[in-house]
């Protein structure tokens, strides 16, 4: 383990609301070893932004990690040229131009149809009736797995996210997550012969990715491409409803819906944490990290760094959010960021 200052946390409280503990770490020990997580946490924006790029020290390759065990080794668990080759293969499906010209009209049509269906009812469950299906429909289109239902897409995404964070080794969670990955593989086999031209499945297949890499990366896209937009859509709407002065800024033309999304993503980062493994001894601010040490880059904490954001716990869509690294930094910047902002 590193010789970083030690900070203890209550896991139950941390899982429910990590932000008070993260604020304490930023103020008192911005790089700190947390025994309950068996990891050294980086909590300040600049430290994360700087060192996340140093893949020669902070490696994403984790052969025994929960994500790799569950999905296979996807691009998120690769570095350097191996990562970039798969990222380039996926890029035609998720480039800003493709999102603007191809996906945006599809997303908008889906949202309008759903709103028109819900309007006569007078009320709805924001997550179940709107955020979940609108996000799932978009993801079915992007992946090319149109044979999946919206509910199936949501279920398998959540099951994989639960599996990737199943550090306690709960058998029911493991069983559910493995069932989800098998279902995804079945749908990939079904869709592969006639996958839509712009879909992730089609462009990666055309680029010659192996079956193993293609399957692993489709699972990766699903794991983050459903639950994160679903929660961001519902969360942004919830935040605006509960902060009427912020909603009024949009209605009066003083702010945009994108401003609201960017602020919500800063406030409740879609990527709360990204793990790394130390592969070469390194010293930072007199803290020595040793090979095999685990490091967690806490992107959720970076979005509330007081150095860049005044009153960081406050939802304020008028603030400048450019310094936020809500979608990561460097080589592992979220490949679906343009699609997420569009949704």
Where are these regions (language model features)?
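Cytochrome P450
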Residues: 1-343
